[in-house]
Amino acid sequence: MANDLPIAAVVRIAKNNGAERVGSDAAQAIADASQEYIAELTREASKYAKHAGRKTIKKEDVDLAVNELNI
């Protein structure tokens, strides 16, 4: 799967959370894992929106999905 997350943003987030340096392969691995997390969260939140008769995902759908996925 192609990754749509900018590597510079991934590195910046990692550094803002304690990493002093981030290798390019590590940044790519973090980006890939993050994209999969976002995809799974979106799939789950979409189920809640559809169940409520909506096409638009709302914050409440994301909150429910986070709880459902235990993340």
Predicted features and spans:
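Terminal helix-to-tail segments of small alpha-helical proteins
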Residues: M1-I71
